[in-house]
Amino acid sequence: MQVYLVGGAVRDHLLGHPYHEKDYVVVGATPEQLLSEGYQRVGKDFPVFLHPKTKEEYALARTERKSGVGYHGFQFFTDSTVKLEEDLIRRDLTINAMAMDETGQVYDPYGGQKDLDQKILRHVSDAFTEDPLRVLRVARFAARYANYGFKIADETLQLMSEIAKSGELDALTPERVWKETSRALMEDHADIYFQTLRNCDALKVLFPEIDSLFGIPQRPEYHPEIDCGVHTLMALKQACQANYGLDVRFAVLVHDLGKALTPTEELPRHIMHEERGLQPVTEVCDRLKVPSQLKSLALTVCKEHLKCHQAKSLKPGTLWRLLQRLDVLRKPEKVEAFVQACECDAKGRLGLEDRPYPQAQYILDAMQIVRNIRAQDLPEHITGPEIGEMLIKYRIEALAQFKQQHDEP
């Protein structure tokens, strides 16, 4: 029985990157042999075992054969005669198809180290096309390693395009698409993930609402980059550079979906695109089963982002109603996420990436003002329904004073 560290841990070890998850493959063993040594079986579809002490995953070396549609459509074969090379060839990329024994010797039958040196993401074999999930995985790797100059091999991108055109992507479950996409959104270059999907024709299959933004013009005085799709990815890039959370990144991604629905005769203006965007944002969230908290912020940013840009010119009552819709009294963290997303929208424009966005602090200061006015601050004779009415009155008056201070030269 021989044990090898495989996959991402070997890749990151060779790159000098930290890694936390370790996967092992066991060659020359049977399930009974591992069970007799105290390993606990956990795999339903194929033999995966937990180490009795470390609880790390150990999988018996296996081969696989395509037997159906999608990423579940495989039959697996495993016994003590399966060789390490046979197990590694079923993996997606050469840089993920390396193994290392306990002495530190690296086994690299498919040129993974060479591709690491040349910064190439390359498929191991033509069997790559048998698993549609690999389109998303490779796009995610492209996003993860963009900082280091990695590029997808032309022939691999061609295979990804073949998968996209084959209809196999339709077999991916919404949960799996969202799992890969949410992980990609948290990479430093999440925009590369979506650009890669577009480059291989997968974006229009998995995210047609986002794909349809490309080619839609905007007014150049507000959007020097002109193209709506380009703006969306530029705004997402801003969210990544600021290291904002998943909720903000997703909201930025879908904030302008309504622009794809603008009547042709109105272009390049996008009147009411905020309202038009609510339906496609809802459809994306429902289709992918996006968590409710993320959906809530995405809809809010879609509907209200222009109000944030106009914040300093809003009347006190209008500003108060905006803060109310943002649930300012119960969820200050949502207000913070909202202004973060809106700032990314404002800065995700060609040549305007570094311009100030004072509206963000203006909204946050206004939030603190209204939150600091509480029922116990009212005169004692105010009771019953009057309390709510007076709180609103006091808050709007405080916002009026706040606005006046900002308006003064």
Identify the function of each model-found stretch.
Residues M1-P409:
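Catalytic cores of the polymerase beta-like nucleotidyltransferase superfamily
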